[in-house]
Amino acid sequence: MDLEKLKNHQKYIRNFSIVAHIDHGKSTLADRILELTDTISKRDMQDQVLDDMDLERERGITIKLNAVELTYHAKDGHDYEFHLIDTPGHVDFSYEVSRSLAACEGAVLVVDAAQGVEAQTLANVYLALDDDLEIVPVINKIDLPAADPDKVKNEIEEVIGLDASDAVLASAKQGIGIPELLEQIVTKIPAPAGDLAAPLKALVFDSVYDDYRGVVLSIRLFEGTVKPGDKIRLMNSGSEYEVTEVGVNSPKPIARDYLIAGDVGYITASIKDITDTRVGDTVTSADQPADKALPGYREMSPMVYAGLYPTDNAKLNDLREALEKLQLNDAALEFEPESSQALGFGFRCGFLGMLHMDVIQERLEREFNLDLITTAPSVTYHAYLTDGTMKEVENPAEMPEASAIKRIEEPIVKATIMAPNDYVGAVMDLCQHRRGQFLTMEYLDDYRVNIIYNMPLSEIIFDFFDKLKSNTRGYASLDYEMNGYQGADLVKIDILLNGDKVDALSFIAHRTFAPARGREIASRLKKIIPRQNFEIPVQAAIGAKIIARTTIKAYRKDVTAHLYGGDRTRRMKLLEKQKAGKKRMKAVGKVDIPQEAFMAVLQTDEDETK
């Protein structure tokens, strides 16, 4: 391996991510770049090439980061090796963005020419600045009738503080501005540094399980080189393996003879034990290990917890294996076993938000052919007990008795909402209604305002974003980050069906709203739970006190239909017999609870009035 020659090649590598607010056109821009650099033939071209999950295509969003290598012949006559990493734009997947940026020297920031800078644009820029990346601004969708590139340039300079004088004006759909962007990537984004003669040091930024090759690690090399036959060590677990293949994705995997410092590619080493690998780990040489590991990533704490249960308990092990494989590919997913009296055995899973939860459930059902029931999502509460201890409560059913609790604290998020000036009142009303505490408000220009609130996470996770969009005709955008815990007057509400507590339907609410929420949920369950052959009382209770009750009426079979004329006592006897049978059935009858019932706990009365 001629290190001097390879060192020269290193000058022509460019590593960059594409970041943007959701729906600003990242994936379409990536498509055009792949097309213009002839990475993909016209025949194989399709929309959202890098979104290789069916789910991503159907929803029109990027869920997973995706790395691809392409070759660009620049105006200076040299061939450059680009490593492009496409990233998600939704707040739930910001962890994927931070992982992508750690593998790059630069970021292409895409801003919609009509929408301008939005909350998630800002959040992603701050992530890129934290990593000290060179940012290339692109104003996309300039072909839209509502496009105003000059106004957006001004916003980029005023709100973000970036020089936008030579921002690329582009339309990814029409292919306008892409050649200019590729030239700016060459001139503005620095080549990777890294000593090829130093011990191997590579960051694992993603991994996926392959049934034939074992775990495939996506890596960015910072120092040294790696080739098949090399012995490697994973610094976190200490496990050692022999490399069987190295290569790059273009976008299909292409095996290479070696990878050098600055490259973004993959390695396989017949790793069959999933627990050995962790995203953020450092790969080094087993014979000549590096002194210390790369910084890796800050651990992401789940925001939302929910129970996942197989409808068939025999599939519990299949669910465990599926979750382990998904965790490889999605480092922010957490899970641990739990059991419920109503649903049997399953797992308590931690997610970054509702979309993340939705995507995981759908991937489990599609990719692993599982049939699941998901309980209503909840957040982590801190219950301070009278004996001086503190208990973290992820499942409402595990909240201790009220008599044992001194106080309860709930997680608070700092919510940043960008909205047009005309909708300030609507945004503030919604935040106040969801127990928000106003922090500050800043007018960004003549049209838009940035409003910051402290809000309980439990009030945001389910439908706050949808409400915000409908109250502002789709113009507002939201970003939030954890901001500690705060005491609140919270109570646990139990739901009883036919006199039995259904632990999976328990939820936690603010005492002020508890009676109304109890009545609301009891009446909603009455509509959702199918009628049985016996009457079912539906009750909501705080401790031993029933705060709401309604009844699901029984089916009534006409047991006297075959009678005609004759003695009335015969009719009465049959009706009494039916009554006794129903009483017996009610004592032993099991109520079938459909999936919608678990989600009904989360809906608010506003949803009912739509």
UniProtKB/Swiss-Prot annotation:
Entry's Gene Ontology molecular function annotations: GTP binding; GTPase activity; ribosome binding; translation elongation factor activity
EC number in record: 3.6.5.n1
Keywords per UniProt: Cell membrane, GTP-binding, Hydrolase, Membrane, Nucleotide-binding, Protein biosynthesis
Residues that, per the record, bind GTP: 23-28, 140-143
The keyword Plastid is annotated on this UniProt entry: no
GO biological process, one term: positive regulation of translation
Membrane topology: Peripheral membrane protein
Broad class of enzyme this protein falls into: hydrolase
CDD domains: EF4_II, EF4_III, LepA, lepA_C
Compartments, record wording: Cell membrane
Residue stretches making up the tr-type G domain: 11-193
Keyword Chaperone: no
One cellular component term from this protein's GO annotations in UniProt: plasma membrane
PROSITE patterns, per the entry: G_TR_2
Top-level taxonomic group: Bacteria
Catalytic activity: GTP + H2O = GDP + phosphate + H(+)
PANTHER family referenced in this protein's UniProt entry, alphabetically: TRANSLATION FACTOR GUF1 HOMOLOG, CHLOROPLASTIC, TRANSLATION FACTOR GUF1-RELATED
Function recorded in the entry: Required for accurate and efficient protein synthesis under certain stress conditions. May act as a fidelity factor of the translation reaction, by catalyzing a one-codon backward translocation of tRNAs on improperly translocated ribosomes. Back-translocation proceeds from a post-translocation (POST) complex to a pre-translocation (PRE) complex, thus giving elongation factor G a second chance to translocate the tRNAs correctly. Binds to ribosomes in a GTP-dependent manner.
Similarity-based family: Belongs to the TRAFAC class translation factor GTPase superfamily. Classic translation factor GTPase family. LepA subfamily.
Name assigned to this protein: Elongation factor 4
Source organism of the structure: Levilactobacillus brevis (strain ATCC 367 / BCRC 12310 / CIP 105137 / JCM 1170 / LMG 11437 / NCIMB 947 / NCTC 947)
Gene it is expressed from: lepA
